[in-house]
A protein has these predicted regions:
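Conserved Lys-Pro-Asp/Glu-containing loop-to-beta segment of HAD-superfamily phosphomonoesterases
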Residues: 80-99
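Alpha-helical substrate-recognition element adjacent to the catalytic core
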Residues: 1-80
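Asp-based, Mg2+/Mn2+-dependent phosphohydrolase catalytic module
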Residues: 4, 98-106
């Protein structure tokens, strides 16, 4: 759902894709590495946004950091709110549990 308080620009030069880690990337790490690289190659910003706390196996996501993807641990805060507080507008979400994008469980 588009936030009506911000202008809709379907033609912005660089859109951001927020990708979940658990049950998305973990289901096929090698396949997702290729997909994420393709997104970057065709001009998207790609970030990893996990509902995890930073203390829950943070090293498990190091391979993504080493590939140049920013990783955000929301600590069970709604992902959309969390990244927007950091000044990041995610245009496309890829998540197995879409409620975590809009709802907190903290």
């Amino acid at each position: 759902m588009q936030n009506l308080s911000t202008p809709f620009d379907n033609f912005s030069p660089k859109k951001t894709i927020g990708v979940d880690f658990d049950e998305v990337i973990t289901d096929n790490k090698n396949g997702w590495i290729e997909v994420l690289a393709l997104f970057k190659r065709i001009g998207y910003n790609v970030i990893i946004v996990t509902y995890r706390s930073p203390q829950t196996d943070p090293f498990e996501l190091d391979f993504l950091k080493n590939l140049g993807y920013p990783v955000y641990f929301t600590n069970h805060i709604a992902k959309k709110d969390f990244v927007e507080e950091k000044g990041i507008q995610v245009d496309i979400w890829i998540d197995d549990y879409p409620l975590s994008i809009l709802q907190s469980n903290a």
